[in-house]
């Protein structure tokens, strides 16, 4: 800044900040709380009740629910404890969960959603709900509702059921519930999801949820990826220690078996009832499963039994029964091998999974076998996990 020609003038920072300031009354500085609507405060409470003036709530900072006109929970509805808000930009989902320990089933009642995010050009969506048990990646592990057309407040009232659910699943698994928008011309779009640890459920007690949908949260950085990998590594080590040095086996589905030793017929009755969540072995995303059983040691190689083939399914029902003539004292030294196969025409059949029951088995498989020996003439049904471990003698018989 210059005064007379050739003279240079200097100004301090206070004078610089005062230049070009419009005259007028001094306005109060806005507080952060002024940008959010406030309900009436408690009677006699300080801080001032009522809502902030409308001109102090910029549209960009308004709560997303205010833009979508989301509603509040219905009076008397039982809301889960970690439901903090009933209105988000993604919407809310209402559902019930019930774990039936007696039948080893998890019942999922998908009720309704409210205030979903618009996904189509008409400002609406074609929503459906997809369920997935984690960890687990097979197609049979996924269940879905029907699609509701052109709505942001869909009502489903559908019951989806997982079979073969054990107490171990309830302890370790998580139910992922995703709401998606169906698009016939392109890929379906993800709207939001909810993840419920099954350990929050109590047997035979229905639990009601009304929860805000959340976005998928990716790992933010390589450092978080490293932390996640370290956590997975520790988890796997704990599992390995729990298995007392045994290798970790891939889960390939579940099978429901019935065992009964008949005192009258002097033999073992093996019931192959059904399978659930089998691994898909064919390119169409399904399998053509059948079940084989062996009672080993099998010196005469006459103990093989085989069910019929069920086409294009990951949840087959067999309801077939096989009989092994054997004394109870001899049965105590035997091992029952049960394997599930995918039938292929003109080539070797694919091994899906298997389980062994006998004195050398572990966990539920051993308990089922010992209960059968200790309770003659009682039909005992149990679910068993199929693993990727192929019995040594079964590999040579895969085409049988």
UniProtKB/Swiss-Prot annotation:
One GO-annotated biological process of the protein: chemical synaptic transmission
Protein name per the record: Double C2-like domain-containing protein alpha
Domain commentary: C2 domain 1 is involved in binding calcium and phospholipids.
Cofactors that this protein relies on: Ca(2+)
Name of the gene this protein is made from: DOC2A
Cellular component, GO annotation: extrinsic component of synaptic vesicle membrane; glutamatergic synapse; lysosome; neuron projection; synapse
Subunit composition and interactions: Interacts (via N-terminus) with UNC13A. Interacts with cytoplasmic dynein light chain DYNLT1. Interacts with UNC13D.
Purpose: Calcium sensor which most probably regulates fusion of vesicles with membranes. Binds calcium and phospholipids. May be involved in calcium dependent neurotransmitter release through the interaction with UNC13A. May be involved in calcium-dependent spontaneous release of neurotransmitter in absence of action potentials in neuronal cells. Regulates Ca(2+)-dependent secretory lysosome exocytosis in mast cells.
